[in-house]
C-alpha cells in the first residue's frame, strides 16, 4: 500500500474460492485471466487489490501455485483473523492485539470438544484466532445456542460463522471478513488513503459481513451459495449498492465494476484487434499488457494479419533497442520480433496461457518510463515466471517506443529453463 501516495481509485476486496477462482465451470481460468488483464491494464497503478479468504496462508499459497492469481496488495486469511501486506506478506501485529481481547483458544478448544456434532477440519485450517469444524446444517442453531453461553460464562467472546453448506468457524469476536475490512478502511483513512470506491465480492456465508460495511459496493457472484442468498433476501434486497451478478466468479466481479460505474470494465482479452486498441489513459503499462497478450495469441496461432502486426511491433522498437534474455544473452529487440515468426502457432491446441502481474510504471525523467512486472507463462501444468523491466521513451502526441527489455528468473518460479523461453 506504500506505493500509493494518494487515495486509491478503487479497492476490490474479494473472496477466492468460487468468487475470484472458478473451480468447477472454467477449467482454463478464462474469467480469471480476463480480470487479471483488466486489473493490470487499468487499475494496478492507482488502486488496491485485496483477497479475503477462509483459507489459511498455507492453503492460499498452494492455490497460487495452481491458479493464475495476481499478487494482492493485502491478503486477509483464515476468515478475517489474519492480515498481511505486500509480496512478503508482512503480518499486521496490531490486528493480532485486537483479536487477543477476551479470547482464549484453549478454552474454546475445550468447550467445542464437548459437542459430538462438531468435527474438526484439517490441521492447516486451525489458526491462533480460529477453530474450524464441519457440521450438519440442521445442527447449527442448536449447537450455537448451547455453546455461546458456555463460552460467555468462561469470559471468552467469540463469533460463529457457517458457510459452504457444512463449514462452522469459531473466531475471536473481533475477527471475521467484515471486521477485517472495516479495520483496513480505518487504517487507510488514518493514512489519508481512504479509497474513493470499494467493491466487496463473495459467494458464501463467511462473505456476508463484507456486505454490511457502510459505503461499500457489493457483488454476490451468480453462483453464490444458498446461505448468502438467504441473507441477501432477508437483509439487503432493497440495497441498490449490492447486486447479484448474472456472471460467475471473476466474470461477476468485472460485471459489477461496470454496473456501479467504478471504472473501465473491458478487459484487453476481449479486444480482438490490438492495432485498434486504444487505452483510456496513456500508460506504458498498457503497452506491456497488450504485448504479452499478443505474444500468447501469436503462439496459439490466433493472430490474423501477421505481417501487419509484426511490422507495427518493430516500428515501436528503437532501432538500437536491446532485449536481455534471462540467460544473459543480448540481442536486438527488432531481431527478437523477427524471430517470433518461427514460433507462430507452435502452441496451437495446447493449454498455453500468458499473464502479467504487478505491472507498475514509473516516469524517471520527462519522456522516459520504466515498467516493472512479472511475466508468467504456462504450458499444461508447467509454469514459469520472469521479472521483467522495460524502458520506454515517448514524445507528446506520439506513442511509446520500446528502448530496452531485461528479464531475470523470478524467485517464485520453480522451473528455470533458458532453452525454451523466448520473451
UniProtKB/Swiss-Prot annotation:
Its cofactor is Mg(2+). Pathway: Glycan biosynthesis; sucrose biosynthesis; sucrose from D-fructose 6-phosphate and UDP-alpha-D-glucose: step 2/2. Its EC number is 3.1.3.24. It catalyses: sucrose 6(F)-phosphate + H2O = sucrose + phosphate. InterPro entries: HAD-like_sf, HAD-SF_hydro_IIB, HAD_sf, NTF2-like_dom_sf, SPP-like_dom, SPP_C, Sucrose_Phosphatase, Sucrose_phosphatase_pln/cyn. GO terms for molecular function: magnesium ion binding; sucrose-phosphate phosphatase activity. SUPFAM superfamilies: HAD-like, NTF2-like. One of its GO terms (cellular component) is plant-type vacuole. Keywords: Hydrolase, Magnesium. It is an enzyme of class 3 (hydrolase). It comes from the Eukaryota. Gene3D superfamilies: 3.10.450.50, 3.90.1070.10, HAD superfamily/HAD-like. GO terms for biological process: sucrose biosynthetic process. Catalyzes the final step of sucrose synthesis. Homodimer. Belongs to the sucrose phosphatase family. This is Probable sucrose-phosphatase 1. It comes from Arabidopsis thaliana (Mouse-ear cress). The gene is SPP1.
Amino acid at each position: 500500500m506504500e506505493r500509493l501516495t494518494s487515495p486509491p481509485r478503487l479497492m476490490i476486496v474479494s473472496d477466492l474460492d468460487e468468487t475470484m477462482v472458478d473451480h468447477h465451470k472454467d477449467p482454463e481460468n478464462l474469467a480469471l485471466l480476463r480480470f487479471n488483464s483488466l486489473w493490470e491494464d487499468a487499475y494496478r497503478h492507482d488502486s488496491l487489490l485485496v483477497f479475503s479468504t477462509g483459507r489459511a496462508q498455507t492453503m492460499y499459497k498452494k492455490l497460487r501455485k495452481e491458479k493464475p492469481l495476481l499478487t494482492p496488495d493485502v491478503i486477509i486469511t483464515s476468515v478475517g483473523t489474519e492480515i498481511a501486506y505486500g509480496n512478503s506478506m508482512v503480518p499486521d501485529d496490531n490486528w493480532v492485539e485486537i483479536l487477543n481481547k477476551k479470547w482464549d483458544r484453549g478454552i474454546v478448544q475445550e468447550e467445542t470438544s464437548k459437542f459430538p456434532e462438531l468435527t474438526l477440519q484439517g490441521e492447516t485450517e486451525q489458526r491462533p484466532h480460529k477453530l474450524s469444524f464441519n457440521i450438519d446444517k440442521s445442527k447449527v442453531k442448536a449447537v450455537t445456542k448451547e455453546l455461546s453461553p458456555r463460552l460467555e460464562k468462561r469470559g471468552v467472546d467469540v463469533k460463529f460463522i457457517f458457510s459452504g453448506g457444512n463449514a462452522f468457524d469459531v473466531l475471536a469476536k473481533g475477527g471475521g471478513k467484515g471486521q477485517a475490512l472495516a479495520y483496513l478502511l480505518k487504517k487507510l483513512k488514518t493514512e489519508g488513503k481512504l479509497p474513493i470506491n470499494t467493491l466487496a465480492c463473495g459467494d458464501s456465508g463467511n462473505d456476508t459481513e463484507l456486505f454490511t460495511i457502510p459505503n461499500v459496493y457489493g457483488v454476490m457472484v451468480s453462483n453464490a451459495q444458498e446461505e448468502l442468498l438467504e441473507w441477501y433476501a432477508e437483509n439487503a434486497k432493497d440495497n441498490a449498492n449490492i447486486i447479484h451478478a448474472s456472471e460467475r466468479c471473476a466474470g461477476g466481479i468485472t460485471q459489477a465494476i461496470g454496473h456501479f460505474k467504478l471504472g473501465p470494465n473491458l478487459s484487453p482479452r476481449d479486444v480482438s484487434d490490438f492495432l485498434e486498441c486504444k487505452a483510456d489513459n496513456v500508460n506504458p503499462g498498457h503497452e506491456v499488457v497488450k504485448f504479452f497478450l499478443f505474444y500468447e495469441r501469436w503462439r496459439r496461432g490466433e493472430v490474423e494479419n501477421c505481417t501487419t502486426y509484426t511490422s507495427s511491433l518493430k516500428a515501436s522498437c528503437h532501432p538500437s533497442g536491446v532485449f536481455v534474455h534471462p540467460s544473459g544473452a543480448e540481442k536486438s529487440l527488432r531481431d527478437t520480433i523477427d524471430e517470433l515468426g518461427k514460433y507462430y502457432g507452435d502452441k496451437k491446441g495446447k493449454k498455453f496461457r500468458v499473464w502479467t502481474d504487478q505491472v507498475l510504471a514509473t516516469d524517471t525523467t520527462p519522456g522516459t518510463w520504466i515498467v516493472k512486472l512479472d511475466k508468467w507463462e504456462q504450458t499444461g501444468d508447467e509454469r514459469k515466471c520472469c521479472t521483467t523491466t522495460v524502458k520506454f521513451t515517448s514524445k507528446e502526441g506520439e506513442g511509446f517506443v520500446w528502448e530496452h527489455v531485461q528479464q531475470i528468473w523470478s524467485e517464485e518460479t520453480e522451473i528455470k529453463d533458458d532453452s525454451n523461453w523466448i520473451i
